[in-house]
Swiss-Prot record:
Gene3D superfamilies to which the protein is assigned, alphabetical: 3.30.300.20, P-loop containing nucleotide triphosphate hydrolases (3.40.50.300)
Family to which the UniProt record says this protein belongs: Belongs to the TRAFAC class TrmE-Era-EngA-EngB-Septin-like GTPase superfamily. EngA (Der) GTPase family.
Name of protein: GTPase Der
PROSITE patterns the record matches: G_ENGA
Binding of GTP 2, residues: 184-191, 231-235, 296-299
Organism: Symbiobacterium thermophilum (strain DSM 24528 / JCM 14929 / IAM 14863 / T)
Amino acid sequence: MKPIVAIVGRPNVGKSTLFNRLTQSRHAIVEDQPGVTRDRLYADTEWNGRTLTLVDTGGIQLDKEGDTIEAHVTRQAELAIREADVIIFVVDVTDGVTAPDLEVADLLRRQRKPVIVAVNKVENLKREDEALEFWALGLEPLINVSAEHGLGTGDLLDAVVAALPDLSEPEPEEGGPVRVAVIGRPNVGKSSLVNAILGEERVIVSDVPGTTRDAIDVLVERGEDKFLLIDTAGMRRKARVEEAVERYSVMRALRAVERAQVVLIVIDAQDGVTEQDQRIAGYAHENGKACIVVVNKWDLIEKDDRTMAKMTEEVRMRLAFMDYAMIHFVSAKTRARVHRLLPLIKEAAANHARRISTRELNDLVREAVALNPPPSDKGRRLKIFYATQPHVSPPGFVFFVNDSELVHFSYQRYLENQLRQTYAFEGTPINLYFRTREKAKLGERPVRVRRVLAGGQTREIRRAARKRSTE
């Protein structure tokens, strides 16, 4: 499970610039104006072999209360602090230690978490001397950086990695419970769905503390089958408490998805698939999880004999990047069709972990090629020598070919469709990789690997030539 690192501080100290520098991106809007970053942004980065999720937050203004935008942003940042494993506290050397800095430092000190003070805009010796003033915050270590110019960011990431806790999640045990995450935007009925599942089954073994801080995992049994509903803390609460948790729960959703085998993506039948639904579904897709789109509040829809088919078409169109996902219609309020969810979850989990023997796989490939030979490209034709399945969860297949550049996306889709038609892969993504073996100099076997991604994009990895053994 990837650790979460929150970048926090008062407004206009360079948090978003630092976020962009550390993630080598332009995710955050950067303007010289306090309060520009109102919503938390997320991006993964890797340093010294560790992958971590960086969170960019809006400026903390503890003197703001009520329903103002500033108060909303501060509450958001405070939630990020509570959920983070390590905190980067950004201050501005040109302003010196301010009263708001001291207030934020006091807030962070109470969290009892690793805090790294990033003294920003330190670009010369004079400012290095001025940065010493920030020892008054009572937090360490202090790292001098210039987010704009990239100075000191390597030292900052070194300090972050050194402070990271071990969040390794044990692999699901064979015969153990299926891990299920329930995600979706606010007010689509996630909490009602969880309660409906629990009420339907009526057999709750226990509330199991999860690895995520303050998370509650609920173990549900149905006959011999076990399901672990991940991180239901806050999801089952009511009224104002539920509203607050729902509104600021994206970080929890990210972690729940990482821990899950199957993800339930809950959407509101009245709204259809929104852009926010697409983004949330993308979290599960990018993590290679088995997915079920749960269309909730179906009882509120006026229906005819085509209503469900039309909604299914809309879901398929709006979530075209995950056309493998199962779709299920429910009413959490009336519990209609909720009883069918656990069997679907069990099926999706089994498909996600499905392995095909090398012999069966190559028989299928030979039949597929005989039925529909690869097209030629400028007189050259793709040849598939053999295939193997190196991993599951999600299933991944490697095809050894004469030249991976000859693999057209349409033929990759054809092979994927043949796999899906022959074997049960409903609900799970499958990855196809194409590996080239080229003619090489004596004693070498260079290998070029090309992965065909959704949408026809390709990613090529050139591996160093491997020496043949001469002994």
